[in-house]
Amino acid sequence: MVDREPWKEPHLAASGSTSMINGPLAPHRVSFAKIHEPLDLPNLLALQIESFDWLVGNDAWKARVEAALAAGRTDVNTSSGLEEIFEEISPIEDISGTMSLSFRDHRFEPPKNTPDECRERDFTYSAPLFVTAEFVNNTTGEIKSQTVFMGDFPLMTEKGTFIINGTERVVVSQLVRSPGVYFDRTVDKTSDRDIYGCKIIPSRGAWLELEIDKRDNVGVRIDRKRKQSVTVLLKALGWDDARILERFGEFEAIRATLEKDHVHTQEEALLDIYRKLRPGEPPTYEAAQTLLNNLYFNPKRYDLAKVGRYKVNKKLGLDLPYTQNTLTEEDIVATIDYLVRLHAGQTETTRNGRTVIIETDDIDHFGNRRLRTVGELIQNQIRLGLARMERVVRERMTTQDIVAITPQTLINIRPVVASIKEFFGTSQLSQFMDQTNPLAGLTHKRRLNALGPGGLSRERAGFEVRDVHPSHYGRMCPIETPEGPNIGLIGSLATHGRVNAFGFVETPYRKVINGRVTDQVDYLTADEEDRHVIAQANAPLNEDGSFAEERVLVRRRGGEVDYVHPSTVDYMDVSPRQMVSVATALIPFLEHDDANRALMGSNMQRQAVPLLRAEAPLVGTGMEFRAAVDAGDVVIASKAGVVEEVSADAITIAADDGTRQTYRLAKFRRSNQGTCINQKPIVDEGQRVEAGQPIADGPCTQGGELALGRNLLVAFMSWEGHNYEDAIIISERLVKEDILSSIHIEEHEVDARDTKLGPEEITRDIPNVSEEILADLDERGIIRIGADVVPGDILVGKVTPKGETELTPEERLLRAIFGEKAREVRDTSLKVPHGESGKVIDVKVFTRDDAELPPGVNELVRVYVAQKRKITDGDKLAGRHGNKGVIAKILPEEDMPFLEDGTPVDIILNPLGVPGRMNVGQVLETHLGWAAKSGWKVELNGQPEGWRKRLADIGALDAPPNTLVATPVFDGAKEDEIRGLLENALPNSDGLRMVGPDGKARLFDGRTGEPYPEPISVGYIYIMKLHHLVDDKLHARSTGPYSMITQQPLGGKAQFGGQRFGEMEVWALEAYGAAYALQELLTIKSDDVLGRVKVYEAIVKGENIPEPGIPESFKVLVKEMQALCLNVEVLSSDGMTVEMRETDDEVFRAAEELGIDLSRREPSSVEEI
């Protein structure tokens, strides 16, 4: 039989086997990669961590800056984000300039709590920020300096997340249009002429737009207001007609505009502009001058930012310093010059001794879109807060006595703290972290989002913005993006991409010198890449690095493909997986999958639930190790040493430098999505470990490698039609042996508050509850750990004081004698919600004395309930190729088709799901999976050519059973290699080779033992269990909450709602003439308030079901018609007026008897029904 033991360690492959893609500390995989990669993968969380390091200016950032400067790079930020912002706001001066306040030297104190404490106690992981504030009295020269507390500043954890009020959040990077100058061309619909326009877009401030219309007039639009002649703007800047003609006289458009211009002096021009911008206000020369200055030339109001200045300089061929953050006259003149040259049909000009190419811009090009990473997003938010604080400081300067003023009395930090809180709590870009598995978290942190404040909106984004663009190559993955309304607006950073100081994404290339490829790596932005000719990573090379072929396949600007002579090649890709994201790079044989299915495969890997026993894929891509380690769910040894002590929740290592380090492991913690985070040691006492080696596995990892699913024996065949339309049949073995079982943890919490009638109390003493129900509660009224609970069970007993009526003298006497005991309370205990059950694994109690609780809360109790969910029909399974389906049937092992040696298959997939979907990768994975499971031994037989030679070159001529293999994307195993491995697969213990070289096996029907007439494809495929579990979707209701107005049941599982019987369903029953069933559905099962109570009563008492009454929605309709002043009367069949009474006494009597609450408020929770 095929070896089944999941805990058996995968064998190491034959010694000297292959190049290590994963690095020396990873489990060994036989790699089919043929391409030498000169560059390791960068740290996959660098996007988040390096950006935040820059913001706070910590030691790691300083070290990176020093290293970059030493390497001769000029494009690095030498001041941190917080430094920039405090420099920007300093000095704050009062109106007369007699005093000023400035800030410098920010520093952080150590955080008060560890990340784990913050998670447990609902705190924010933050550190106090202090800054030195200097107050200068300019008249006396006196300086007062103080260290001022600027609030608690949220810190990033090592994993690139923030912990805000106890929950892990991720700040997603935003893709926005870069500040700069953009030229575009549109076609006029009436005259069919080209209209050229241009926009100067700042980081903040007013836009300046220029346009040459169909009559060849050059117009300007200031701050999105009415269009004016461009010569008016030039004259407002102090130019006269002669100077304009001297500079632009060669261009017909400017001459035509000047002729039509009626303004002659600077003053007239300024007043003209003022009238158009501020209609209705009396224009004065000073006001007009100030207005124009404030719009474009005042650094407080207008900011191009460094990146904007860089783009403007680059586009227009200027040499202004990066510190020049406002517009200049030179910018405006150069822009006009460029626009009229573009209109005149010129293609290039020289400026400052450089050739400037004249062309329109593509707004979707990655040279014109930049990333606002975490650091910049938070920096912008602090800038807002400081601007609000600045206003307060100015006010206080004027009101306080100048002698008594100190920095502390001027500063109010509330607006700063509030703006940071607001960003982390409510911004669209601060998101609840996706923690289903390590890959989900990693991808979430590498996400690029074009939505959000200052970005696009779903509704307005057109097809062009969403489409794949040639400049995405190596920067943003063309495959991984959501399906649905956000398609193309949310992407994922490519594996090798990095962000430069200006926020543009760069990707690495190997330099090619004189037709020879070197190992020198240059990072290029999308703009720089356009100027070069680039070869693919798989271009064949000779030993000396020269190209082996006479014509090399390259790509040029705009995605054009061409064959050229090797000497004209400038660069070469560093790696075949350079263009895809991490999730996509985990799909083996990606090159054989249709892109739509690959997209689903990438997205579904993020929904895989951590299983009870993780198993690394037999067929991987070599990315598994880095993905798991960088995601941070694997524990890594920080120093080399010897393991001293190992327990389930801690590992102690004695390092070589004499220090001891203890690593604490997370045990059965709940993730944001309710999956289970559990780490387990994978080292033994006395074992030697190296720095960077995994010492404990986390969820979805095995041996430090990402392990999202299980390797299952699959047969592609139809079975009695049960796997029709993507349905899946699985063997009962997967249920029995917990192969696809997972643990899910739910958190339930209850708090005891102060109410107007007195404090709530957590107690075991609950009114009208039997001792039997309280059996599992301890003396405090809290459930014991280890108790099995089902829906409706009490987790925490709690009573709330009831409203009191006037007391009788006897009651007052009792109250006086016995104190508070006789007070009326009602049961408001925390109960297990419908549809949930499991085992209590943890209870946390917080009281006012030992924890900071919100105001009004005296005690807080959290109960964690875990459930083990076995795989069941209705659960969703998927492979890595977008091949997804729902389990339709679980067959006993003895009924499953079996191989010649009696091994039953685990899972049956429909072969018709493959050709139409064009994801053939799953078939190749199946065959290679079989070869990897069986092992192989290839004899050269004196013919080392073709696939045998290739296998010999990578040292993979033999491998024992259960060998892990890697087939990297675009550089994996070829079809002939897989065929060869199947031919040479090792036989089983009986000497049988069950699968032929075509990958097919003879299968037998488990029910009859007869062989199937045709051979069937059999092999091992990696299957994941997705988060869409049937237990979470199943829902039932008899009675429950009703809507306040219509009195119809609410909808949805969350509201404990009913099943909607809609308009079309009503038609269906009408068509069958099922009148009584329909009447029942529309009245007593829905909104006939009287009827439904009477029916309940009749069922309880065993009587006949009464006639339905009038539905509430009919009464609502009548009321609405009356509101339209229509006199509506309801007549019976004999013409008598029907009285529409409100719910009568009889109903209330029956309801009270049956314990049904008829009050019309909507219950706030399921328990109150």
UniProtKB/Swiss-Prot annotation:
GO BP annotations listed: DNA-templated transcription
PROSITE patterns, per the entry: RNA_POL_BETA
Keyword Transcription regulation found: no
GO cellular component, one term: DNA-directed RNA polymerase complex
Source organism of this protein record: Acidothermus cellulolyticus (strain ATCC 43068 / DSM 8971 / 11B)
UniProt-recorded name of the protein: DNA-directed RNA polymerase subunit beta
Catalysed transformations (reactions): RNA(n) + a ribonucleoside 5'-triphosphate = RNA(n+1) + diphosphate
Entry superkingdom: Bacteria
